From Swiss-Prot:
GO terms for molecular function: DNA binding; structural constituent of chromatin. GO terms for cellular component: cytosol. GO terms for biological process: chromosome condensation. This is DNA-binding protein HU. Belongs to the bacterial histone-like protein family. It comes from Streptococcus downei (Streptococcus sobrinus).
Amino acid sequence: MANKQDLIAKVAEATELTKKDSAAAVDTVFSSIEGFLSKGEKVQLIGFGNFEVRERAARKGRNPQTGAEIKIAASKVPAFKAGKALKDAVK
């Protein structure tokens, strides 16, 4: 499984940037996506995929310890849908 450090190393290798500059670039991409999503905007990366905020409706759940029914409030969750190029690359 690759992690953030692996991604930073790949960016540094591909761009000949230092790892410090690559880390800043990767952090900027992640924080930018987070910023757009927090404003309710969709981030579309053609071929790679779409990041968006989806609304989850209020629903009933159960407390696993007591079995009592509880109300779970509506919430917003981040979502990602892979694009065609990414899906094809994984096949």
